[in-house]
Structures are given as structure tokens and as C-alpha cells.
Amino acid sequence: ISLAQIKKLLQIIKQGLKAICDNRDLIAKGCQA
């Protein structure tokens, strides 16, 4: 696995977590911390 692939995976994970946080008000407060 190349460094570029790792960075891409991390970006996808971050976007996924952000989407979850945006969809759940209670969790959103914790995710912004």
C-alpha cells in the first residue's frame, strides 16, 4: 500500500465520520471536540 493510498483511505474515513456526525445531533457535539 502506498502513502497516497493511505492518505486517500484516511480522507474517506474522515468524510464518513463527518457524515455520521452531521446526521446525528447528539454525536455531532462529540465529534467537534
Swiss-Prot record:
Keywords: Disulfide bond, Secreted. One of its GO terms (cellular component) is extracellular region. The keyword Amino-acid biosynthesis does not apply. The keyword Amino-acid biosynthesis does not apply. Transmembrane segments: none annotated. It is found in: Secreted. There are 6 heterodimeric myrmexins which consist of a small subunit (SS1 or SS2 or SS3) disulfide-linked to a larger, quite structurally unrelated subunit (LS1 or LS2). Belongs to the myrmexin family. This heterodimer may have anti-inflammatory properties, since the myrmexin complex (composed of 6 SS-LS heterodimers) inhibits carrageenin-induced edema in a dose-dependent manner (after subcutaneous injection into rats). Heterodimer composed of subunit LS2 and subunit SS1, heterodimer composed of subunit LS2 and SS2, and heterodimer composed of subunit LS2 and SS3; disulfide-linked. This is U1-pseudomyrmecitoxin-Pt1 subunit LS2. It comes from Pseudomyrmex triplarinus.
